[in-house]
């Protein structure tokens, strides 16, 4: 328990102390990935993240107003709503989640229809994204240290899972950020609330649960193997 707290404090301090260069690498890699996917980056904008962690530089892409959104994006919205509705009728287990996503899509379309000429500042997206990302990166060691160091039979393996989850969170954030920027560029704010929920908050939770499940599965498997070996030898 003491080791878990020490590791958590050390990693959180390092993430806070090197926040600016970490976000710069994040921005450069995100811009590079966007370029590979032909997503235009029109510039970079300094954004404030938290007191003591500023300024960060966020990549900027052009975001169309709702009146400028093409027919393809509008048809994709309609197909998505119909598809989610059909799936919700068929599968009761995930019906509540799908209904929530449908409500987000309908609300987004209604608000965009009322404010067709509203211009969204892509720099605001970058600022919100980095605020959420830095909060996750600073707090993540506290969760992973308690989860992995307590349940892993070997301390080295627990430390490995902690570092791997931190690195994966960084890489996963780049991919999700570029995906969200692509949605903004091609469809404006039409899909954005739904996408933000899926690749933002829910995405962070899913990745943490994924790592926790894998680590527990491996630790449990090794314990069963050790018990089987001990039973066979005795």
Model-derived features with residue positions:
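Hydrophobic N-terminal alpha-helices or hydrophobic patches in metabolic proteins across all domains
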Residues: 1-234
């Amino acid at each position: 328990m003491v080791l878990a707290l020490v590791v958590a404090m050390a990693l959180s301090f390092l993430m806070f102390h090197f926040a600016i260069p970490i976000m710069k690498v994040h921005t450069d890699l995100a811009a590079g990935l966007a370029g590979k996917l032909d997503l235009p980056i029109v510039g970079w904008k300094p954004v404030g993240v938290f007191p003591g962690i500023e300024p960060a530089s966020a990549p900027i892409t052009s975001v169309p107003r709702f009146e400028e959104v093409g027919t393809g994006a509008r048809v994709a919205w309609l197909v998505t709503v119909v598809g989610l509705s059909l799936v919700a009728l068929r599968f009761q287990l995930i019906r509540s989640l799908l209904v929530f996503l449908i409500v987000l899509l309908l609300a987004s379309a209604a608000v965009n229809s009322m404010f067709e000429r509203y211009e969204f500042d892509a720099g605001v997206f970058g600022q919100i994204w980095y605020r959420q990302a830095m909060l996750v990166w600073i707090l993540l060691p506290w969760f992973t240290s308690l989860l992995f160091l307590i349940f892993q039979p070997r301390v080295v393996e627990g430390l490995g899972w902690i570092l791997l989850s931190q690195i994966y969170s960084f890489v996963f954030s780049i991919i999700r950020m570029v995906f969200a920027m692509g949605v903004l560029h091609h469809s404006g704010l039409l899909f954005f609330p739904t996408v933000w929920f899926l690749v933002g908050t829910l995405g962070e939770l899913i990745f943490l649960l994924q790592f926790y499940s894998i680590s527990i599965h491996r630790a449990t498997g090794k314990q069963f193997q050790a018990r089987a070996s001990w039973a066979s030898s005795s």
